[in-house]
Amino acid sequence: MEYLIKTPCGQLRGCPTNKEGVIAYKGIRYATAGRFEYPREVTSWEGVYDATKYGACAYQPRSFYNEEEMPKKIFYYNEFRKGETYEYSEDCLFLNVFAPENGGEKLPVLVYIHGGGFTGGCGHEKHFDVPVWPQKGVIGVTLNYRLGPLGFAVLPELKEEAGYVGNYGLYDQMTAILWVKHNIAAFGGDPENITIMGQSAGGMSVQQHCLSPLTKGLFQKAVMCSGGGTSKMLSASGPEKSYEFWQMIMEKCGASNLAEFRQVPAEKLFRIWQENKKASMGGGCSPCIDGRLVVGKGHEIVKRGEHHHIPYLIGTTSHDVMPPILYSMAKKWCAVQDTPSYLWFFERNLPGDDHGAWHSSDLWYWFGTLENCWRPFDSVDDTLADEMTDRLCAFAKDANPNTEEWTGWEAGGKSALVLGDHDSKMGNPSSLKLWVTMFTNKAPGE
């Protein structure tokens, strides 16, 4: 059987998945972009687009080494990537759509932005493949975006060329959301009922989109996992402080101008960046204030009331990266909203080791992909995953994560829905315990 649909861009061929009744349309090119250029949305193609296999992931450090030989990376490799094969390329602007086989009209849409510190990850690692959401009446979308130097380098020459600089990865994400808005009706989705969701750097990305005037109207709700909220400490700053660092990288790559820098092999660029990134405060790869998409510091934008006034789900895990800080940011974000906003705290100690509810552990449950994991999950995990996916899909439908079966989640930032080894309930974690955990974490994140 062929799974053909017609979109505004042209025809697409999808494929069945391991989830009953869920059809995948994989590796859809949503944009094109040259190196250090802003993305251009794809609006058409010729013939039938083969969307039966995933597209290439963005180049990232792990593209150029064997993760099994890197002790510091082995935990997350074993968890999410072991046994899988990934293709990496600078040509990486692909997204994946997961839709019900029997279709529907005006189904809610959930667009997920992966994490990885803005330097790693992709939209089809084990925990994303395949989300259970379409079985619950929600269309799912995952995507790739440019990472590391290719996604976040800044140079004065680049600003002179385009009028603004940096954040190529964020613009990729925005263009993917635009593509979804323009095309998702062909999959049965509602372009006026889009929820964006992200975890870690993906959650921070969602946060930036929720602070931006450029993205208003593109989505109606947002979910931020382990990366949402604002703080003075974690606010974006202007690109100027990083110019000197990236000029040094360009020189060390043997390039004397932009044209030559654009021709440097990706492996060489990543190697030289990694060798030098700790030599300067400007050596990181993360969002900067570009004056267009990112227009200022988050806490100042919120103070002025210029953020998106939409419903939010936001939360963290008990053994997260900087657990007391991330939880406090999420709690404060909920507290200042004038729209229904819901706080959660995930504390299920995953079976199989003693790492607790580590950074990213909740994703197995939000996506309903426990069967892809090596861990000895039991009925507690099955029930918890069912509750979390039910609540997430209910929120995507009408901004209320309570259902007939799963009730009691109160909006506001006074307390969180605590999800763990027990029946879910409203409460707050111990601040002291979070601080102790911060310094004893066994899987601090990647």
Regions from the PLM with identified roles:
Residues 1-167, 191, 281, 377-388, ...:
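Non-catalytic accessory segments of hydrolases
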Residues 23, 92-93, 171-174, 178, ...:
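A structural signal for well-ordered alpha-helical segments within the folded catalytic domains
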Residues 30, 36, 45, 261, ...:
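Bulky hydrophobic/aromatic "packing anchor" residues in well-ordered structure
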Residues 77-252, 302-322, 338-339:
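Serine-hydrolase-like catalytic core of hydrolytic proteins
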Residues 146-149, 200-201, 344-353, 406-414:
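Short, solvent-exposed turn/loop segments enriched in Gly/Ser/Thr/Pro and often Arg
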Residues 192-194, 256-260, 343, 403-408:
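Surface-exposed patches in mature extracellular/periplasmic domains of secreted proteins
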Residues 221, 229-236, 252, 256, ...:
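Substrate-gating cap/lid region and adjacent catalytic-acid/histidine neighborhood
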Residues 412-436:
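C-terminal domain-tail junction helix/linker
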